[in-house]
C-alpha cells in the first residue's frame, strides 16, 4: 500500500491522473462491459443452464483473475500497455507481434462498439445510422485527445451507474414479477440449431466470463489509481460486477 502508483509518482495531467477509487471502478466497469455482457449472454443462453455455469466459473476463476493481474502488472510497470510489458520480458520482436495483435483486436471491437449502438439508435429514432456513427467517432476522437479526467472521468461513471441500474431493474423484474427461466432444466451440449457447446459457448460468452480484450483496457485505469490496495476492488471487482450483469442477461 505504501508503494507509489504511476498516477502519484509520474502525473502528467493527461493519462496519468489520480482519481478516486469509486470513479476508477465505475470507469473500469464501463470500459470492460459495454455491449459484451449483454449480447454475449443473450446468445449464449441458447445453450441452456451450462451458460450460467460458465459465467460463474469463468468470471471468478479466470476473467477476474486475468483482469486483476493485467491491471496490477501495468501498475508495477508504470502504467505500460500489454505490448510494452510483453516486450520488456520477451523481447522487441514479441512486442511488435503483440502490438499488431492488439491493434487488430481493438479495430474489431471498435467496429462492434460503433455499429451496435449506431444501429440501435437508428431503429429507435428513425434517423440514418451513419449520423450516429459520425457522432460516436467524434466522441472517440475527443475522448482520445483530451485528458482522461475531462470526458472519460466525467461521462463514464454516469453511464456505469445506468448500466448497474438497468441490471438491478431487470433482476427486480425477475424476482418480483413471477417470471421463470429454465423451468424445464435440460442439460445439453448443443444449441437448438445443433451447434456444439464445446467450444462455442466459451467464445459466445466472453465478456461476463473471461475476455482477453480487458487486458487492453486495464492499463488505462492502472494510470489513475492512487493506491495499490484498491487494485483488487477495481480490477477484480469490476469483472465480478460484469459477471453478475452477464448472469442477469443469461436468465432473460
Residue ranges and their predicted role:
Residues 110, 114, 118-135, 143-144, ...:
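Hydrophobic alpha-helical segments and their helix-loop junctions in multi-pass secondary transporters
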Residues 44-74, 83, 94:
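Extracellular loop-to-transmembrane helix junctions
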Residues 146-160, 213-247:
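Hydrophobic, small-residue-rich membrane helices and short re-entrant helix-turn-helix hairpins
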Residues 56-57, 123-137, 199-207:
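Structural signature of hydrophobic alpha-helical transmembrane segments
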Residues 102, 106-110, 160-177, 229-252:
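Selective recognition of specific alpha-helical transmembrane segments in multi-pass small-molecule
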Residues 1-38, 227-230:
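Membrane-interface "cap" regions at the ends of multi-pass membrane proteins
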Residues 16-17, 49-56, 84, 88-100, ...:
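Membrane-interface alpha-helices at helix entry/exit sites of multi-pass transporters
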Residues 157-160, 166-215:
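Helix-loop-helix junctions that connect adjacent transmembrane segments
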